Every structure is written in structure tokens, then in C-alpha cells.
């Protein structure tokens, strides 16, 4: 009995530490067999979809390939620093959105996929409460998008959890057993339950610099989301320039290879004091989402929320023809 108590305490401490120490952790293995499949998947996309037991197949379009695109050697390692904060939307993504709508995706909903930097305590939820944000004159044009996605901003995503890394997001062990089907991954569960047309993907941790696995699993997530005819928006993070544990190069490369929207938050944080980070070099500095207040706009969180809103607005306007 004592052994069980100690084991539970250890597991709890590990989960709590996962988002406090960005260098901690390792990738969990994705099961190669489930209750409905006993054969190991033969491709990255197969690995991503093997655990889904309830999602009906959606129509596909010709340019959605299950093969990972070959990296393009012309993209510089620091290319993200010169890319726009607000994404440019490709024709491919417009096609994904249109096919998704034809398949029944909800144009009024978006979902979030990510770790502790995506919890409703700090991220986007204030846009569902007019008393908790202020756009000011400069950003007043964003209000129609806030209204359009009402309810999605403060919704608790089934694919967001402190300590959830890119591997865990595709692992059924991390799914909510009360709301998700047996063998369903957190991402598959969130897409089934919320039926979004757009998702933000913001995975902040990189586990002692294991960027090879980070790249592998993030590509898997992007491929799965595209296979469900949902538009993914990939996010860069605030980073200290010269950091050897940078994920922004990987994120940018994947967005480039798949022609998916890049929400380049990392660039908006570069001019901020301490690059928008607290003393630990990972968590963002805090202030309210009052975008007409110069003091608020010296901190990391207002910029993360503002640029996320700008990215969602830009993608929604492009895919819906509201240029």
C-alpha cells in the first residue's frame, strides 16, 4: 500500500515539474498496437492515426500526401527571425479548409493543441470576456474575429495539458478518460468533440535539445491534423537569441515544408525586455491583455495573446475569402 502511495506521489511530482523545467523530460513511445489494431504502423501518418477508433474518414484532396515532404535546403536556420508574425495562407490551406467545411467541420470553432503555455488561465480566454481585454484603436479590426469564434477562446481543450509534449499529444495515455473514447489520442479526441475548422499548435518544450524527436513528432501532429481536413497554425516561441535549445528553426521548417500557416510569436518577443521571458528563460512575463497600454505591451503574455489573435484572424479571413 505504501509503495502505491509513493508511486502516485512520484507521478504527480513529475507532471507538475514538466512545465516548470523546460530541459526535463523524454518522449513517451506511441503504442504500435491498440484494441482495434495489432499490426505496427508502417508510416508516420499511420502511427498518428492507428489509435483513432471513432473518427469517420473525411474526404481528401489530391495534394494532401501521407509522405513527409523532403526538407528544403534553401531555408536558413535563422529564417524565422525574418519571417512575418502574421501568417501568409497558401492555396493548399484554403483547399484544406474548404474540404473540411464540406465534410462538416464547424467554421465557428477553433481548437488549441499544446502544453502549459496554452492553458486558459493565460492564453486567449480573456477574449470571451470584454472586461478582460482592450483592443484599442489600432487593433479594433480584430473584434469581428473575436465575435465569430465566441466560446472557443475560453474553451478548455482536451489536447492541452501542463507537461504534455509533442509525443504525449498523440498518446492515448494522456487522453481524458471521461470524455475520450478508448484508444483515442488527445488530439483525435479534441477534434472529434469540438469539430474545429482551425487549430493552433504551440508546443513549447524541447527536452534537453532532442530536436530530432521534436521534429518527428511535430510532423506527425501536423500530418494528422491535415488528414482530418482541419487547418493547423504552427507557433514559434519566445527564445533567448543564441539559445542552443531552439525549437523555432524546427517549427519554421515544418511550416515551410507543409505550406501551413506560421504564427511567428517568437519574432514579436525579440524587442521586449528579457525577450518577454521571466528569469527562468522559459515562462512568459505577465500583464493584462490591454493592447493600448504601453506598460502592458512590454510583457510577453499580451504579445502572445495579441499575435495569436492576429494569426487566427488572418487565417480565417484568407480561408473564408475575406481578404
Task: Cite the ranges covered by each PLM segment.
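Bacterial N-terminal signal peptides that target proteins for export
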Residues: 1-7
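Ser/Thr-rich, Proline-interspersed low-complexity disordered segments
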Residues: 19-88
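Conserved SGNH/GDSL esterase-like catalytic core that processes O-acyl groups on lipids
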Residues: 104-213
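Loop/turn elements at helix/coil->beta-strand transitions in domains of secreted/extracellular proteins
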Residues: 106-109, 194-199, 226-233, 258-261
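Extracytoplasmic/secreted cell-surface and envelope-processing proteins
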Residues: 120-122, 208-216, 235, 241-247, ...
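Active-site segments of SGNH/GDSL-like serine hydrolases
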Residues: 200, 204-206, 219, 223-251
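Catalytic His-Asp segment of secreted/periplasmic serine-dependent ester chemistry enzymes
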Residues: 241-323
Amino acid at each position: 500500500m505504501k509503495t502505491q502511495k509513493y508511486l502516485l506521489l512520484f507521478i504527480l511530482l513529475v507532471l507538475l515539474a514538466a512545465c516548470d523545467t523546460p530541459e526535463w523530460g523524454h518522449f513517451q513511445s506511441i503504442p504500435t498496437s491498440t484494441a482495434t489494431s495489432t499490426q505496427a504502423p508502417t508510416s508516420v501518418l499511420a502511427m498518428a492515426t492507428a489509435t483513432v477508433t471513432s473518427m469517420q474518414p473525411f474526404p481528401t484532396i489530391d495534394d494532401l500526401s501521407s509522405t513527409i515532404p523532403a526538407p528544403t535546403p534553401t531555408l536558413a536556420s535563422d529564417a524565422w527571425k525574418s519571417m512575418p508574425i502574421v501568417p501568409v495562407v497558401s492555396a493548399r490551406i484554403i483547399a484544406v479548409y474548404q474540404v473540411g467545411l464540406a465534410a462538416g467541420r464547424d467554421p465557428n470553432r477553433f481548437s488549441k493543441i499544446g502544453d502549459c503555455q496554452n492553458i486558459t488561465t493565460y492564453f486567449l480566454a480573456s477574449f470571451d470576456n470584454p472586461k478582460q481585454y482592450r483592443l484599442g484603436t489600432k487593433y479594433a479590426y480584430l473584434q469581428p474575429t473575436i465575435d465569430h469564434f465566441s466560446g472557443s477562446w475560453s474553451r478548455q481543450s482536451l489536447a492541452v495539458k501542463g507537461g504534455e509534449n509533442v509525443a504525449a499529444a498523440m498518446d492515448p495515455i494522456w487522453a481524458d478518460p471521461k470524455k475520450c473514447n478508448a484508444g483515442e489520442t488527445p488530439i483525435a479526441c479534441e477534434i472529434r468533440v469540438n469539430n474545429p475548422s482551425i487549430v493552433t499548435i504551440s508546443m513549447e518544450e524541447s527536452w534537453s535539445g532532442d530536436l530530432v524527436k521534436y521534429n518527428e513528432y511535430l510532423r506527425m501532429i501536423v500530418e494528422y491534423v491535415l488528414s482530418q481536413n482541419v487547418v493547423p497554425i504552427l507557433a514559434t516561441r519566445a527564445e533567448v537569441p543564441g539559445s542552443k535549445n531552439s525549437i523555432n528553426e524546427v517549427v519554421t521548417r515544418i511550416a515551410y515544408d507543409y505550406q501551413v500557416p506560421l504564427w511567428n510569436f517568437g519574432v514579436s518577443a525579440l524587442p521586449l525586455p528579457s525577450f518577454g521571458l521571466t528569469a527562468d528563460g522559459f515562462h512568459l512575463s505577465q500583464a493584462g491583455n490591454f493592447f493600448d497600454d504601453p506598460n502592458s505591451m512590454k510583457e510577453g503574455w499580451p504579445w502572445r495573446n495579441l499575435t495569436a489573435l492576429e494569426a487566427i484572424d488572418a487565417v480565417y479571413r484568407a480561408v473564408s475569402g475575406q481578404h
